[in-house]
Amino acid sequence: MNTSNKSYDPITDIIFTKGLKIKSATHKDRKLDIILNNDLILVVSLKNYKKLNGAPLEEVNNFKIIGNGTGLHWPTLDEDLSLYGFLKEFFKQNIEKKRKLVIA
């Protein structure tokens, strides 16, 4: 019998077993290109994030990588977003859109 109160989280598992971290990020056309240390690129629309969507471009461009590559921080907007959250949203959107997900 398992007496642990911990539950398995596949997103956390992927991040830690693969050692995923944010290597860099760029902003263009109201989207963030988030480059991971395995060269995977996540394209994130700012419309999904209230503080970023309505912010002036100068403030959107003022961010830094935090937590040893686990997130992004916008000091002037008081906004923090995580790699975990980006991946969670990616999986959620792809499942909701009923896209073909290939397991190879």
Question: What is the predicted function of each stretch?
Answer:
Residues M1-A104:
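Motif-centric detector for short Cys/His coordination patterns
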